[in-house]
Structure formats: C-alpha cells, structure tokens
Amino acid sequence: MLAFTWIALRFIHFTSLMLVFGFAMYGAWLAPLTIRRLLAKRFLRLQQHAAVWSLISATAMLAVQGGLMGTGWTDVFSPNIWQAVLQTQFGGIWLWQIVLALVTLIVALMQPRNMPRLLFMLTTAQFILLAGVGHATLNEGVTAKIHQTNHAIHLICAAAWFGGLLPVLWCMQLIKGRWRHQAIQALMRFSWCGHFAVIGVLASGVLNALLITGFPPTLTTYWGQLLLLKAILVMIMVVIALANRYVLVPRMRQDEDRAAPWFVWMTKLEWAIGAVVLVIISLLATLEPF
C-alpha cells in the first residue's frame, strides 16, 4: 500500500508539473501577444489547482519516502524520520523541490504581470532537480553528470510535449471565432516546438535506457518489460502526432468541418496515452532495473 501511494504521488506530481509547464510555455512564448492574456485567463484556474497538487504531492512524497526507508506507515508520520530523510541525497534535493513548488503556487496565486515566464522558469528548475534523484543517480563521475543532464532534457521535452496538448485543444476552439488567425499562429508555433520536443524525448529516452542497463537493454526483468511498454506507447503517440500534423492539418485547409473533429479526437487520445505513460514512469521508479 505504501509503494502504491508513492506511485500515485509521483504520477500526481509529474502530471501537475507538466500541466503548469505547458500552460506557461504557451503564455510566455508560443501564443501571439494578442491572445496571451486570453490564454492566461483561460488556464489560470487549472494552473493554480495543478500548482496546489504539485506542492501537496511533493511534500507528501518526502514523508512517504520516510516510510519506505523505515518500517512503514508509522514512520511516514514521524518528524525524526523526516529529518533523517533530509540528510540523504534525495532529501537534500527534495527539500528544494518542495520550496520551488511552494514558490510556484505563490506566483500562480499572486498573478504577477510576468507570471507565465516565472512559472516556466520555476517548473524548468523543478524538472532539473527531479533529474538528481532516482535511476539517474546510479552512475558515478562524468557519466553521472551526463546521465542527469540527459534525464533533465528528457523531462523538459516530455513536459513540452504532454503539457502542451491541452492548450492545443483550447486553441482549436478559438479557430472558429474572432481569434482564428492568432489561434492558428499558436498552433503552428507549438507544432514547430513539438518537433524538437518529440525528437528530444526519443533521443534522451534511448540514452537514458542505455545509461541504466547498458546495451542491449534487458527485457528479462519487470522493469525492462515496462520500459518496452512505455516505448511502444510513446511511439504510438509519435504516430498520432505525425498523423495530426501531416495528414489532418493539410485536410483542414480543404474540409475543416470534417478534419477538425478528428484532429481534436486524436489529440485527446494522444494526451490519454501520455497519461498512461506517466503512470508507467511512476511505477518504474519503484523497481530495480536489474
């Protein structure tokens, strides 16, 4: 039960962070200036809720880690165990994760003028911190630095891809209104950015696997089999993304009324598969790769 709680908290934390990152990415960079305020208003409530869950899950994960290190649920609620966790490498990094999650929530609630850029930088910093815990710390020396840097790139690219899909769906709603031109601009910018994000996810994901298990990656363990399932699901997402961009988008120029609903449905499917991938990632963190 404690392990399941850890998996659930990791899923909530990753998903929340990626949503805040994706919305901030649109508000700070991808959306044209004329609709940035409109997008910020549309995403604000969801961003705030995601920031709350990010902070709650990060804090709870520190306590649950104490239970995993100790004797179970009793140690989850022990301040002495929390202090012991903070003395570990995980605890030292995770304390900053909690601090940044708190600052992210404060920014989302206070809504300063440059909020999207601040949230973008804060969530990026949290993904970099996440690369300093887990399987990315298995190596030593220069290899460890390469692995952690690569894992940070993997997380940021994944957040740009997965976190940007919900804003895509909302921009599709704007296409039929007065903001049509600006919405199309935002979608095209995300498409351009998405190409790099997908390539980054694939390249860094392969390198991550090689740095953890070596070549060829092992498929005899539960960890290896889950990694293979994750890779298959990611490739399905790639196929959907390519079909959207290079099949449905050209068709929208000819018959928007028929192609647009398919585009929306496929994007929802892509997002749902991405959520399943995040569940698998959360589960992989609890397993030994060997």
UniProtKB/Swiss-Prot annotation:
Membrane topology of the entry: Multi-pass membrane protein
Highest taxon of the lineage: Bacteria
A Gene Ontology term for the protein's cellular component: plasma membrane
Biological process, per Gene Ontology: copper ion transport
Periplasmic membrane side: 1-10, 71-89, 139-151, 217-222, 282-290
Places the protein is found: Cell inner membrane
Keyword terms, alphabetized: Cell inner membrane, Cell membrane, Membrane, Transmembrane, Transmembrane helix
NCBIfam families (alphabetical): copper_CopD (NF033808)
Name assigned to this protein: Inner membrane protein YebZ
Species of the source: Escherichia coli (strain K12)
